[in-house]
Amino acid sequence: MLNYRKLFWPLCVLLLLRSGLELWQYNLRVTDNDQSLYWLAAHDLAAGRSIPAFVYGQDYNYFVEPWLAALPVKAGLSPVYVLPVATACMALLPFLMFAWYARRNNLHGGAALWLLIPLLLPSGWYIVTAMPRGFVNGLFLFACWPPVQNLAREKLRWLLSGILAAVAFCVNANTLPLAVALLVLTCWPHLRRGAMYFLHLAGAVPVFVAHHFITQHAQQQAGGLLHPKWTLQWTADYFAQGITHISQWLRWLVPGNASLWLLLPLLILLTWLCIYQQRRSLLFALAAVLLVLVLSLGINKLHDGREHLHYPFSRMWLALPLLAGALAERVKLHSRIALSVFAVCAVAACFSIGAPHTNSQAPELPLRIMRIDSLKAKSDELTLFIRTEKINTVVGLGYPEWVGDQQLLFHYTEINSVSAPLFVIPEYERRRTLLSKEIQGKILVLGGDEGKWIKMGEIQRKVNVCGMSGALLRK
């Protein structure tokens, strides 16, 4: 008989060590220009400046990570390094909280399960979930689910469950499968009680109303939106494409990247156990989740991805590992079967140990990837040039060829400069309010062609800075 009680703390330590190792090997060495927006937000918060509800230039994807990073940044740490660490903690916290409360309720096997699930996942999962890009901002909130469900007052529990599920969904829709499963499992014993439905709705409806007005406010901001949210569409063509390429959405979410050949047997085993043990609530939750996941394959937004760590399709289904824990912890499993399942998953996981981390710049990627040490060297060169020439404004042109490099370079230099000049990218400026600022003094323009430079001011001399051609202008 396995003694699961003794596994809890060793598994916690192993999980934290694994996460730290993955951070050190990749996320603290490689970044992209989408992450640079979160640097700016954390830097602004640390300096006491307000930030928008959503990522700059958008009316979706709430800023959550910068708020967690603001205090360390204010203490003097760089947001470039603080944010990946904070985001990795956000990804792990739900697993740790579910495990802690399972242990507290003497469900030691369930606690071990919650810790083993992330431990068995490929390196890609750790890398993707440590990117401050809003991938795990909604799932992170489900760390509050176990303490809410352990409240003694039933009606307060229902009210807070409705609030929590609605907030998580509004923050990021990739939480929907997990929210569906948890709501089914917690509400199942009370299906005939009207108060349960009323209190869940009483919690959820005000959240959706508030989200609507926050979105409207973002849409009415000066300068407009650079990236408005998608108009969601469901089509049979997308659905057929999704079904035939479903492994794209499972990438890095199954031990060893095994995808369907491992997932299907586990799904069949879980279904059989639900039927054999007469777990109707679990069977219904499983069916509801599968329906949500399969139908979602027909939505256009779900197909906005690449087979790449920095823009994965699987970011849409990041709830799957948490779903596995929520469903599997509720079935009774003989220790021999549990060991057999673990052994198969562990063998599969071995295939991803030491797998090479891809930081290559694939041509079809809609963002720029760069090593942080290379970015620092370029930023030092730009900073020296700015100080030497006493530049007041740095303008980036040449969209779309140079915009990723310029965002990374400008944002990194801005957060690391005591008295930074105004940095602006007129053709692709995320902080829309900067477009109304008057450009004055000595201007460094990078990228674009000479015709655009002349329109901005008098050319004093042409330069080449950080591999980009440009000019010094006088307004």
Residue ranges and their predicted role:
Residues L23-N33, A46-A70, K74, S78-V82, ...:
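Membrane-proximal lumenal/periplasmic loop motifs of glycosylation machinery
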Residues K6-C12, L159, H200-P206, L260, ...:
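Signature aromatic-anchored transmembrane alpha helix within multi-pass, membrane-resident enzymes
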Residues E22-N27, P66, V80, P94, ...:
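Aromatic- and kink-enriched transmembrane "portal" helix at the membrane-lumen/periplasm boundary
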Residues I51, Q216-C274, I299-R306:
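Membrane-lumen/periplasm interface segments of multi-pass, membrane-embedded glycan/lipid transferases
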Residues C12, L16, V85-L107, A143, ...:
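Transmembrane-helix motifs of polytopic, lipid-linked glycan transferases
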Residues R157-A173, A179-V184, G203-P206:
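Membrane-interface alpha helices of multi-pass inner-membrane proteins
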